[in-house]
């Protein structure tokens, strides 16, 4: 399967935008009676939301831990937009010192929204509810333009989303100043504000997405099948200390 895997790896990396995420997986190592925790990483090429007719595809890789060197290795040939969560292991990918140049960081609005939503569910905070309402207005626009060409998506975002994002930022900065930084809502708002530029990148690029749900969906099959992953991960990487194109899970969408 190696030639097929290598071909898919090249195809997935040969694009302008990728979605990435990871999940823990228990690994039954040869000769040991107990399991260790490894990681499954996903890299998704899928531009259908921006009107692309290119086939989507997913490349998965296994690593024995969550160190940032693994995505660095996986993404060595990639140049472009990387949509991901705020995991610090990705930081060097966005550095100008990265070999081949820095990748463009795009954060996940859904991840940021989830933190605020969790606060609202537990506290029914009016401030959290208002934040969710404002974010839902942005998502309503994304629903309208899903599948349109990049240029049309960008035009709509500039005409409608830009002002909403500016208003949200001003409102959140003001309200965050009234909150304890140790409160759950204060932590959620600070999380959003600390990533603001990366969260808003999609406003200025019709190819980018507002969130990283594409990668999260790709990992669902792994999460549902973790019991079957013990032996699979053992087979994938019995002798390799790091994941590589020849030591991966892969599939198309």
PLM features: what roles do these ranges have?
Residues 1-253:
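Catalytic center-proximal scaffold of phosphoryl-transfer enzymes
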């Amino acid at each position: 399967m190696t030639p097929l895997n290598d071909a898919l790896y090249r195809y997935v990396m040969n694009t302008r935008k990728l979605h990435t995420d990871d999940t823990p997986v228990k690994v039954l190592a040869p000769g040991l009676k107990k399991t260790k925790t490894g990681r499954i990483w996903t890299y998704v090429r899928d531009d259908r939301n921006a009107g692309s007719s290119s086939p989507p595809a997913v490349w998965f890789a296994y690593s024995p831990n969550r160190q940032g060197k693994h995505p660095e290795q996986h993404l060595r040939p990639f140049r472009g937009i990387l949509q991901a969560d705020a995991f610090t292991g990705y930081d060097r990918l966005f550095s100008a010192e990265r070999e081949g140049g820095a990748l463009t960081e795009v954060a996940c609005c859904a991840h940021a929204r989830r933190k605020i939503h969790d606060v609202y569910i537990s506290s029914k905070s009016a401030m959290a509810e208002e934040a969710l309402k404002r974010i839902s207005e942005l998502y309503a626009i994304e629903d309208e333009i899903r599948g349109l060409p990049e240029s049309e998506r960008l035009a709509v975002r500039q005409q409608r989303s830009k002002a909403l994002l500016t208003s949200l930022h001003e409102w959140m900065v003001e309200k965050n100043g009234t909150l304890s930084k140790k409160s759950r809502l204060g932590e959620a708002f600070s999380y959003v504000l600390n990533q603001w530029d990366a969260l808003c990148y999609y406003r200025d690029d019709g190819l980018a997405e507002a969130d990283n749900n594409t990668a999260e969906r790709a990992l669902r099959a792994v999460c549902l099948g973790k019991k079957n992953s013990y032996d699979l991960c053992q087979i994938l990487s019995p002798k390799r200390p790091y994941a590589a194109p020849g030591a991966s899970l892969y599939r198309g969408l």
